[in-house]
């Protein structure tokens, strides 16, 4: 009878697997995952290590869903199914395993655009952070927290965390994708501060790095973020130019990104009064929405149709704003209500315009109240 493989040896291999996941190296991660699964069949009994393995399967699938949304991998369980396997023993977990369980669950909630839920899990994970000794893992924590607070428009808190993450990533060349993503978050925060001149250099640096590593997805995302920055600064011409560049790369290389790009392009054209051209891109965007993960962008396209068609669909606008309210997406409420108000104001429907401007003010108040998310 062959001797059982020590669980410590399998644990080392799981650590290597996680390293490849954090580097977004799918082929290497797949190879190590298969090796770990084979070793576990011959491993000595170790319940903690099996939990660690389950957590890493969950994290592996989160990576795949981010890089290749909608793609299936044989009979593998989905993220939702994997979530059930890691939730069951959670109350028994301590230390590093508890940290991973909470941190990965926060990442899942973030991907579902449940940002308040995500921050709640990250805050619980932070209590276990003293058990984390690896610098890259600390950078991962700061990056994900910064990302969540950015989406909740808690700009100062986001900037505090992202600078800590970037300081680590920049010293590790293998983590160039996380460096690019960190530059995105910094630029987004500068945009929220309305310092557009400070945002663009970070986005251009991200684009240059993405081109250096020849990563089509992040080339497209960099172009998209540059376009969004120009749009926020009011430079419609430069925004449209970069949206179209992002759309070209997306159509050719990363089609799952196309609805997001076309939404940004459509909205900019609508605000610039080029609604006929915008509605062509809206139709193209809706045609590309098949996966459940794009439901959010379907709602946004429907919002544009409701606001900018010849007869404004006020009820539909209110329904969509209610959808955003349920998800605490106050920044989206602010931007969408502002667009609706501007359209009503331009057609001299001042009562409706005033009602939507009040929603803008309410959303701004809710964003400021969001500071309670990180009050201890």
Curated annotation (Swiss-Prot):
Its main location: cytoplasm. Changing residue 175 to A: Decrease in phosphatase activity in vitro. Displays reduced activity in vivo. Changing residue 47 to N: Loss of phosphatase activity in vitro. Displays reduced activity in vivo. One of its GO terms (cellular component) is cytoplasm. Changing residue 51 to A: Displays wild-type activity in vivo. Induction: Part of the rapH-phrH operon, which is transcribed from the SigA-driven rapH promoter. Activated by the late competence transcription factor ComK. Repressed by RghR. Belongs to the Rap family. This is Response regulator aspartate phosphatase H. It comes from Bacillus subtilis (strain 168). The lineage of its organism: Bacteria, Bacillati, Bacillota, Bacilli, Bacillales. The gene is rapH.
């Amino acid at each position: 009878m062959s001797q059982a493989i020590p669980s410590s040896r399998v644990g080392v291999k799981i650590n290597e697997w996680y390293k490849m996941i954090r580097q977004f190296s799918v082929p290497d991660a797949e190879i190590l995952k298969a090796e770990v699964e084979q070793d576990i069949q011959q491993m000595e009994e170790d319940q903690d290590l099996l939990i660690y393995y389950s957590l890493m399967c969950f994290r592996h699938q989160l990576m795949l869903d981010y890089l290749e949304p909608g793609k299936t991998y044989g009979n593998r369980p989905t993220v939702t199914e994997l979530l059930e396997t890691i939730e069951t023993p959670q109350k028994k977990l301590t230390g590093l395993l508890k940290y991973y369980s909470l941190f990965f669950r926060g990442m899942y909630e973030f991907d579902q655009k449940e940002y308040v839920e995500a921050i709640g899990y990250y805050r619980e994970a932070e209590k276990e952070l003293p058990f984390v000794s690896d610098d890259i893992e600390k950078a991962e924590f700061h990056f994900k927290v910064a990302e969540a607070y950015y989406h909740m428009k808690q700009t100062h808190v986001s900037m505090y965390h992202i600078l800590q993450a970037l300081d680590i990533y920049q010293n590790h060349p293998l983590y160039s994708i996380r460096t690019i993503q960190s530059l995105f978050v910094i630029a987004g925060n500068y945009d929220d501060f309305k310092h557009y001149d400070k945002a663009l250099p970070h986005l251009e640096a991200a684009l240059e790095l993405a081109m250096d590593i020849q990563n089509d997805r992040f080339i497209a995302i960099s172009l998209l973020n540059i376009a969004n920055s120009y749009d926020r600064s009011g430079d419609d011409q430069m925004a449209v130019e970069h949206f179209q560049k992002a759309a070209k790369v997306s159509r050719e290389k990363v089609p799952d990104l196309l609805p997001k790009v076309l939404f940004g392009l459509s909205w900019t054209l609508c605000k610039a009064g080029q609604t006929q051209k915008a509605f062509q891109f809206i139709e193209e965007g809706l045609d590309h929405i098949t996966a459940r993960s794009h439901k959010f962008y379907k709602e946004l396209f429907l919002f544009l149709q409701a606001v900018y068609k010849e007869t404004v669909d006020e009820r539909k606008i209110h329904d969509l704003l209610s959808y955003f309210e349920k998800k605490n997406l106050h920044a989206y409420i602010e931007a969408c209500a502002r667009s609706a108000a501007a359209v009503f104001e331009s057609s001299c429907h001042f009562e409706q315009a005033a009602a939507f401007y009040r929603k803008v003010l309410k959303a701004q108040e809710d964003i400021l109240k969001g500071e309670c998310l990180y009050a201890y």
